[in-house]
Amino acid sequence: MSYAEFLEAKMHVGGNSGFKATYLPDCLFDFQSALVEWATLKGRAAVFADCGLGKTFIQLAWAENVVRKTNGRVLILAPLAVGFQTVTEGEKLGLKLTHDRDGTEKKARLVVSNYERLHYFDPKNFTGVVCDESSILKNFDGKTRLAITQFMRKLQYRLLCTATAAPNDYIELGTSSEAIGEMGFSDMLSRFFKKVERTMSRRDEHQGCNYRFRGHAERDFWRWVCSWARAMRRPSDLGYDDAAFRLPPLVVRDHFVKANSPAPGMLFEMPAIGLQEQREELRRTLKERCEQAAELANSHSNPVVVWCHLNPEGQLLKKMIPDAQEVKGSDTDERKESTFRDFALGNIRVLVTKPKIGAFGLNWQHCSNVVYFPSHSYEQYYQAVRRCWRFGQRNTVKVDVVATEGQRQVLDNLKRKADAASAMFEQLVGMMRNELRIERKNEFVKKEEVPTWL
């Protein structure tokens, strides 16, 4: 073995464990076909594509290729209430998908279910698995996340699809890598990163922002990510035309609500400082904020989605908005699915729900009016807005953010996170674009340079 071959062998780059795609529907765009071909050839891959770029078509085409190659079955895991949408999208491709809630369907080739129902299924009955909106895996508790990862480990073909705001959470990238069998997130952290501080809590160790790249590892890290994942916000990120994928204008308006009474023990209203005071202010201004949100929702005759975070908010909003329907955590899965379906079909004008319930995976291009109660989570805000502001939306999307005076810092924090996420994704896409053109050269063994006078 030469020295160059020795160094080549030490590089950690994912290989191919798939096959050449034979099923590429004519309705796919060129970049979608390219991603299907790439993911099928990889066998185990991740696609980080922004909202509205057709991830459902991509994953269904990939799953059909696995079915035709292995004559086996593929399980498609999706967030709650997204299953019916996946089945509908499959019909557009001429594919028959079965929505199985309890693992009793044994003959269907393409099976759709929810993450929460994974325990009903046996991996021995499948040859491939798709995790739709895989970024929500980090929202599950450790037991559920471990069960999903262990289920995937037993299958030969694996695909992750998500439209996360920006894959700048290194832990999430490590979790994705572990799920598809490339490298565990603990191994990833020890190989490419070092802790910012030596003293950390166990909770801090699961926050990607507390790690930084080792001095030599950043380029190698993104080369490794490129070996099993593709990230894109628009087709041009992969060298294709953006003509059919133009986002409509987005108008964001902030509405600040003042409390009618000061905090207990105060003579006049003071800005909320810290999380505890912000929460107290939210509960104290519950009525005022809901009145403002209801006024905004009632001013539209078109569909509106109102995003809240507290149960009392949802209950009061439903009372203040005459034709509103609420989806809450205590609802049965069947009721959640039916309500989301009715809203998508236009049978419900105003939908009230929480981002953690309905902000992932659903397509609501028919709705262009959003009312949002902010929190510190940028991902929830991003995903909530992108249910409506996505490719395929024909109208200007209006987002009304209803906040208290004490939440100005929260909005500033969201803007800071948005700028950081945009910069991170810009850097990531640029690095991926460069890495796709990398030619491996021997830059370590060079000829000795001899002075010209010798």
Give the ranges of each region predicted by the language model:
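Conserved helix-turn-beta segment of the N-terminal RecA-like "Helicase ATP-binding" lobe
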Residues: 81-104, 182-183
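Walker A/P-loop
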Residues: 42-62
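Conserved helicase ATPase core of P-loop NTP-dependent helicases/translocases
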Residues: 305-307, 315-316, 322-358
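Conserved pre-motif I regulatory segment
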Residues: 8-48
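Conserved Walker A/P-loop ATP-binding site and its immediately adjacent core
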Residues: 56-61, 71-92, 167-172, 309-311
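Conserved P-loop NTPase motor "coupling/switch" region that bridges the ATPase
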Residues: 71-73, 92, 128, 136, ...
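Conserved interdomain hinge at the start of the Helicase C-terminal
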Residues: 281-309
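A conserved SF2-helicase RecA2
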Residues: 376-454
